[in-house]
Swiss-Prot record:
Homodimer. This is Glutathione S-transferase theta-4. Keywords: Cytoplasm, Transferase. Belongs to the GST superfamily. Theta family. It is found in: Cytoplasm. InterPro entries: Glutathione-S-Trfase_C-like, Glutathione-S-Trfase_C_sf, Glutathione_S-Trfase, Glutathione_S-Trfase_N, GST_C, GST_C_Theta, GST_N_Theta, GST_Theta. Its EC number is 2.5.1.18. The gene is Gstt4. It comes from Mus musculus. Conjugation of reduced glutathione to a wide number of exogenous and endogenous hydrophobic electrophiles. It is an enzyme of class 2 (transferase).
Length: 240
């Protein structure tokens, strides 16, 4: 068997892996795991990834989870162009630094916006208290300012003049609120960086990867399996 990637492009980490593999001509079989139908909890998928998370990579008998680890693996195995994960000690450390920071500072609050503004009301029929949304938006504003001041500064990209894995991961995570028609790219510096990253990836590939996300408001959640809906409703309580 060749390389298999288990993904749902609603997930920002999955989009990062998908875009990287497609951009670099890495051949793979796309194994779709539907998050909205709870397929990541299926017996078949748990055998692939007991953590029940996406994405997962299967390369022969070797199985790997966690998107950052998968991106590093693909970089090394397929000898991706060096700008993605620079060999220079300090530039590579800068990528590593961002990857360590972004999990809680970018990924979590960006996902919260999508859940609070769209998914919770859509599935439960209840609005999240305004103060909860405002608190999350304040956190996002603060963290984006830190991103600009600490990581982007006055550079074209996080590591300098060329796109890296850090830029790719950052942008797909910041796109997550777009599923609820919320735009976080309000500063000119951030908006200009966003466009540079999109163009470096290729606009066609970029928007192909985000098509499922931007169409999420059109999802008919009445088709959701009752058992999965109950599990999601239990999960959503922590956002209320």
């Amino acid at each position: 068997m060749g390389l298999e990637l288990y993904m749902d492009l609603l997930s920002a980490p999955c989009r990062a892996v998908y875009i990287f593999a497609r951009k670099n001509g890495i051949p793979f079989d796309f194994q779709f795991v539907d998050l909205l139908k709870g397929h990541h909890h299926s017996k078949e998928y748990i055998e692939i990834n007991p953590l029940r998370k996406l994405p997962s990579l299967k390369d022969g008998k070797f199985i790997l989870s966690e998107s950052v680890a998968i991106l590093f693996y693909l970089c090394r195995k397929y000898s991706a162009p060096s700008h993605w994960y620079p060999p220079d000690l300090h530039m590579r450390a800068r990528v590593d630094e961002f990857m360590a920071w972004q999990h809680t500072a970018i990924q979590v609050p960006m996902s919260k916006i999508l859940w609070i503004k769209l998914i919770i009301p859509m599935i439960t029929g209840e609005e999240v208290p305004t103060e909860r949304l405002e608190k999350t938006l304040d956190e996002v504003k603060r963290n984006l300012q830190q991103f600009e001041e600490k990581f982007l500064q006055d550079k074209m990209f996080i590591t300098g003049d060329h796109i890296s894995l850090a830029d790719l991961v950052a942008l797909v995570e910041m796109m997550q609120p777009m599923g609820s028609n919320h735009n976080v790219f309000v500063s000119s510096k951030l908006a200009e960086w966003r466009m540079r990253v999109e163009l470096a990836i290729g606009s066609g590939l970029f928007w192909e990867a985000h098509e499922r996300l931007v169409k999420l408001p059109n999802w008919d959640c009445s088709t959701l399996d009752p058992t999965i809906k109950m599990r999601i409703c239990d999960f959503l309580q922590k956002f209320k």
